[in-house]
């Protein structure tokens, strides 16, 4: 996750240009409302924050978003103290929503204006933890199920070990750390242990939908979170090939050669591109093959943390999975790794090569406490318990939470200095000790928590973390520490503070954005993330937790940061902290493997048990009621819940064009429409949007003001042709297909939140597909049947071929026969037909429009038709 120069752009001209453009395009909105976009639990302390550029005296009501019924009245906006958190908004107010406890979907509405919040839900979250697990699978090295590809099979060649340098060591597997493709035991050991902790604390929240390779729809009888944890365990075993040996890092910053898919790695470490990479042995001494050296003093941090993970695995695989052989293998590794840590107390840091950035962890007693406690649980050997107590007192309150940073504006520590960000060792030891020691352990947690709570008093959102690099990881750590403290003591004193930090991650923050990719599905969330799968494949990767806001002073001192577009959050940037959803800012919007793994427990805490795998959205489009496949507007005609015709009492109708493989009619269609000042709708696949040859016509259609929407990413057949009720894709496949389509639209500036309608591939779907689409916030539309206009793609030798003249005549015949004519019609043709059809209907679009206008029809875009 450590970068030097990923974005090579002009250093002077581009920032100035972006500033000018941003200044010209900033919204004139003077009041904004911030809520947790994913929603609130019934008994939560629920808070909305109102930002205003002028004094605000409005009174709010809460309305049911589906029925419009007022459920709570006379909610006052309580003014908060002035602070540097408002950007251009100088006034902050808080609205308490805590009296609303009935599950449902709501909006906060100002009684005297059209100001309203985004929709929010009250009730348990869907299975967002499964989205986070899917992100982890996308980060896998070796076999990657997201890419269905194998990478880095040559990892790697040893350095600093007892064997000769460049000896081959099998270090394949593990996870790529972030947007780069380095692998660290520092982070992987923590991620592995934290997933097992999440499993043990929230077993009912995890399902089985993939196999051990992460392949979809191949359940193997093991909860997916344990499949993912085992991916980490297997890698740790490889890095610990024999007693007394441990490797800690694969590759270094020579990896940073722009975005690349892992199977096509262009980095060359001296053995050719996409070949061997260095594997660093943990010798407990300063390392670095070039000018920059680490400050390592021992190996206890990584050895202890790995030992803790192995000891936990022993318990789980022995008791829950009944795999005694693997359990015993893990226990043996745990004891040997722990012994290594005792022999070399101290910390092994990450290695850099040509840049000054590395993982600077310099704590280790917490890891040894964690390992000793877990080993005592596994073996009941008293020496482990004695060690755990000793290390606990040595670790004490040591935490990033203890930093004095009242201004939130300075980088107070080296990157990842006090890692992991939560000392789980205190929690692991707590049930094993006497009452006095229990109080001592609880006090360690409480000390850090109270520091954060005190600092939060100066923040209108109730957040008190220092804004170090990866501040979102600190927010997750605070939530986790409060939760573990509550489990230990039963003390709920800090529960509201924990909720405020959760809400910060999910949209109640100055920027009004979730910090998780794709969550909630129809909310504001990171899209232009610093991730190769996003940037190269133009596909969304749900679930990744991005680094998050960073102190402006730190941001300004980092190398290689250049925004690639105007700052959409320019109005809201606080004085001392910045956040950007821009690929050029690796410091705030790069998702990380370990931060996401830590957050799995947080998501599981707030989700319902026994939920289906996919989370779906928590916020609906303003055009669609969440989860509803009923026919909400009796002006329209529906088939299987999809709209197939608009208002039949109006002479307005829509011209719709779909496209996947072919686009040869684009210019002719655009010219015909422009000449007659007609706006139409184009539903195009992700494949169409990604095809370089189509870029010019897509940009023109957008510039001309046409509606551009999704038509699936890969043009999948969703439902069986002969048995329409038989769905041919899983919900996960459907959601990924649609999300990938939207990701391909994003480079053209098409905001999914402004695209409420979806036209399915093959113009074929069923009610289940409509339900899934509706749950994501999108209404399915389809063509009005009866004219056969949709047959304009058929090849000359197709038995169902129909000529363009015949299609045009059938449209006219239908208009004459139907008492309502073409009122409300959705008339579908294609933007291209391919080389096998020589008679192209798109050459008749001008003639068609002239005839429609002569009959008094008003062709408009589909979003206008279905208002």
Regions found by a protein language model. Name each.
Residues 1-30:
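Bacterial Sec-dependent N-terminal signal peptides
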Residues 38-114, 134-193, 197-198, 219-222, ...:
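Aromatic (Trp/Tyr) and acidic
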Residues 45-73, 78-88, 327, 346, ...:
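N-terminal carbohydrate-binding/catalytic regions of secreted carbohydrate-active enzymes
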Residues 115-122:
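Edge beta-strands of extracellular beta-sandwich domains
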Residues 185-187, 192-199, 236-238, 247-248, ...:
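Structural recognition of the beta-strand scaffold that forms the well-ordered cores
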Residues 359-363, 378-379, 398, 659-664, ...:
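Acidic-and-aromatic substrate-binding clefts and catalytic sites of carbohydrate-active enzymes
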Residues 619-656, 662-667, 675, 805-809, ...:
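N-terminal pre-catalytic segment of deacetylase/amide-hydrolase enzymes
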Residues 652, 674-802, 820-833:
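Metal-dependent polysaccharide deacetylase catalytic core of the NodB/CE4 family, i.e.
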């Amino acid at each position: 996750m450590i970068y030097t120069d990923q974005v090579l752009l002009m250093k002077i001209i581009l920032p100035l240009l972006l500033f000018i453009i941003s200044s010209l395009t900033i919204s004139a909105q003077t009041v904004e409302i911030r809520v947790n976009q994913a929603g609130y639990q019934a008994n939560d302390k629920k808070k909305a924050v109102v930002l205003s550029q002028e004094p605000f005296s409005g009174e709010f009501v809460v309305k049911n978003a589906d029925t419009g019924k007022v459920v709570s009245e006379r909610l006052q906006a309580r003014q908060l103290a002035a602070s540097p958190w408002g950007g251009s908004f100088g006034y902050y107010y808080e609205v308490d929503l805590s009296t609303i406890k009935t599950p449902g979907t709501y909006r906060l509405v100002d009684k005297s204006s059209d100001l309203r919040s985004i929709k929010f839900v009250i009730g348990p979250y869907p299975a967002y933890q499964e989205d986070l697990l899917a992100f982890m699978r996308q980060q896998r090295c070796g076999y990657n199920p997201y890419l269905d590809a194998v990478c880095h099979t040559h990892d790697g060649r040893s350095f600093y070990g007892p064997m000769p340098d460049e000896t081959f060591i099998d270090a394949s597997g593990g996870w790529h750390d972030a947007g780069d493709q380095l692998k660290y035991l520092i982070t992987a050991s923590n991620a592995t242990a934290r997933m097992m902790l999440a499993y043990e604390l929230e077993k009912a929240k995890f399902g089985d939908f993939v196999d051990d390779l992460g392949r979809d729809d191949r359940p193997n009888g093991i909860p997916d979170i344990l499949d993912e944890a085992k991916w980490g365990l297997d890698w740790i075993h490889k890095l610990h090939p024999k007693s007394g040996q441990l490797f800690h890092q694969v590759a270094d910053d020579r990896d940073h050669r722009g975005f690349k898919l892992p199977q096509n790695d262009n980095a060359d470490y001296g053995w050719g591109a996409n070949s061997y990479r260095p594997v660093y042995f943990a010798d407990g001494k300063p390392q670095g093959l070039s000018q920059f050296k680490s400050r390592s003093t021992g190996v206890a941090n990584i050895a202890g943390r790995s030992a803790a993970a192995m000891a936990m695995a022993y318990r789980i695989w022995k008791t829950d999975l009944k795999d005694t052989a693997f359990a015993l293998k893990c226990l043996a590794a745990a004891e040997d790794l722990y012994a290594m840590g005792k022999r070399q107390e101290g910390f092994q840091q990450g290695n850099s090569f040509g840049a000054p950035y590395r993982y600077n962890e310099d704590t280790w007693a917490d890891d040894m406490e964690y390992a000793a406690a877990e080993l005592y649980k596994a073996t009941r050997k008293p020496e482990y318990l004695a060690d755990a107590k000793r290390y606990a007192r040595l670790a004490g309150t040591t935490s990033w939470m203890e930093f004095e940073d009242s201004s939130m504006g300075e980088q107070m520590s080296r990157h990842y200095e006090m890692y992991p960000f939560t000392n789980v060792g205190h929690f692991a030891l707590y049930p094993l000790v006497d009452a006095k020691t229990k109080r001592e352990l609880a006090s360690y947690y409480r000390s850090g928590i109270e520091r954060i709570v005190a600092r939060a008093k100066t923040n209108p959102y109730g957040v008190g973390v220092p804004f170090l690099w990866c501040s979102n990881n600190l927010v997750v750590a605070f939530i986790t520490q409060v939760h573990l403290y509550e489990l230990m003591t039963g003390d709920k004193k800090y529960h509201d503070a924990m909720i405020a930090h959760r809400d910060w991650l999910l949209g109640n923050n100055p920027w009004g954005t979730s910090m998780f990719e794709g969550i909630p599905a129809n909310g504001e969330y990171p899209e232009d993330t610093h991730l190769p799968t996003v940037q190269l494949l133009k596909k969304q990767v749900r679930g990744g937790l991005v680094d998050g806001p960073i102190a402006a002073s730190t941001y300004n001192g980092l190398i290689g940061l250049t925004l690639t577009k105007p700052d959409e959050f320019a109005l809201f940037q606080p004085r001392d902290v910045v956040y950007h959803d821009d690929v050029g800012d690796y410091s705030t919007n790069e998702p990380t493997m370990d931060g996401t793994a830590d957050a799995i427990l947080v998501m599981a805490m707030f989700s319902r048990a026994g939920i289906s795998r996919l989370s779906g959205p928590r916020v609906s489009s303003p055009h669609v009621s969440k989860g509803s496949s009923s026919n909400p507007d009796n002006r329209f005609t529906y088939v299987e819940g999809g709209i197939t015709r608009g208002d039949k009492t109006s002479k307005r109708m829509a011209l719709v064009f779909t496209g996947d493989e072919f686009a040869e009619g684009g210019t002719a269609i655009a010219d015909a429409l422009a000449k007659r000042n007609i706006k139409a709708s184009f539903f195009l696949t992700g494949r169409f949007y990604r095809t370089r040859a189509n870029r010019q016509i897509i940009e023109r259609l957008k510039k001309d003001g046409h509606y551009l929407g999704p038509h699936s990413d890969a043009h999948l057949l969703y439902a069986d042709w002969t048995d329409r009720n038989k769905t041919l894709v899983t919900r996960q496949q459907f959601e990924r297909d649609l999300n990938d389509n939207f990701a391909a639209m994003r480079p053209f500036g098409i905001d999914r939140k402004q695209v409420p309608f979806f036209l399915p591939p093959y113009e074929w779907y069923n009610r289940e597909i409509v339900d899934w689409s509706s749950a994501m916030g999108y209404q399915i539309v389809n063509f009005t049947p009866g004219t056969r206009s949709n047959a304009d793609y058929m090849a000359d030798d197709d038995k169902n071929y129909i000529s363009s003249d015949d299609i045009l005549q059938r449209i006219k015949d239908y208009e004459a026969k139907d008492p309502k004519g073409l009122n409300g019609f959705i008339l579908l043709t294609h933007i291209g037909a391919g080389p096998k059809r020589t008679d192209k209907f798109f050459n008749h679009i001008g003639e068609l429009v002239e005839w429609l206008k002569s009959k008094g029809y008003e062709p408009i875009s589909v979003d206008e038709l279905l208002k």
